[in-house]
Amino acid sequence: EPYRRQRQMCIRDRIYSPSGKEWTMTKFIWDYVKRIPGVKLEIDKIGNLYITKGDAESYPCIVAHLDQVQRLHSKDFTAIETEEIIFGYSSRNKRQEGLGADDKNGIWIALKCLKKYKILKLAFFVSEEIGCVGSEKAVIDFFTDCRFVIEPDRKGCQDIITEINWTSLCSPDFLKATGHEKFGYKETDGMMTDILALKEKGLGISCVNLSCGYYEPHTDHEVTVKEDLMGCLRLVEHIIGNCTETYPHQPEIQGRREGIYDEFDEAADEIFALLDQEDIWNVEDLYYMYHSVFPDLNMEDYQRIYTEYYNLYPMEEHEDEKILS
């Protein structure tokens, strides 16, 4: 079983699925799933996959996205697996290349659970990385009989995302029922991903996004730490096994006016560009520099933007660039 599990990881990681060209990954999932008894597969016009296993009044649900950011993918690309990590490599070009573990790790977890459980729903979305295109056009009725939605689509090993862009994602009862703290996870807020798009379409059940063991996402130095991936799988299995009731939840946007999202996104674009040039600014600097331009944003908003930037581009990368230059 360990060998088969590792082999499945490597097969999945070799698949190249940039945004808008996810068909190879879709075909891999389709061929994998159709061998599992009692499974119904559907695909919508935009290319999202919907999978239902078993016949029940309510279902646990896992979602993930099919696409990846990396555009560098040599013909001899292979996934190298050691005892501890998985990374992409081109022997011909003698360089590391990104796995697309964001969100192939989520896909792997979803498919592992599909084999294990008799009752489960999965949804796989296209083009998350270019603006949640697939989830914004998802068939929302598919989720009507779901108890909750889990999305393994976060870097690292300890984050359980319960709020995105001031929108709460889950009820306190569901968060408590997950038992996440026993698995080393802690509650925090996150960035735009598919479950937020579902919430904005009116999804009325609890959702969370979980760290699933990938690091340095969106780069050619991306790696999967296998133990952290397995840690996420263990938490997902615990939630499926223990959260057997439906956990209703309506998103709450706390004290924000309509249009704040546009201003926040515009400010983030400008600040990201500034920090790309020089990382000498702190949160207070950014607030005083941009407050007159974006008056509806407060200090907490600037802290979110600052944190999001360094989540995507860790400080070590900037130090490396300085040394190289």
Spans of model-derived segments:
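Acidic, low-complexity, intrinsically disordered interaction modules
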Residues: 277-303, 315
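Zn-dependent metallopeptidase/amidohydrolase metal-coordination segment
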Residues: 186-232
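Short secondary-structure junctions
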Residues: 35-43, 81, 85, 181-187
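Single conserved hydrophobic/aromatic residue that forms the stacking wall/gate
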Residues: 1-7, 11
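A non-catalytic alpha/beta surface segment that caps or lines the substrate-entry region
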Residues: 15-58
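Acidic/histidine-rich catalytic neighborhood of metal-dependent amide-processing enzymes
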Residues: 94-173, 182-183, 187, 194-195
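Active-site metal-coordination/substrate-binding segment of hydrolases
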Residues: 52, 56-119, 129
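His/Asp/Glu-rich mid-to-C-terminal helical/loop segments that flank catalytic regions of hydrolases
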Residues: 216-281
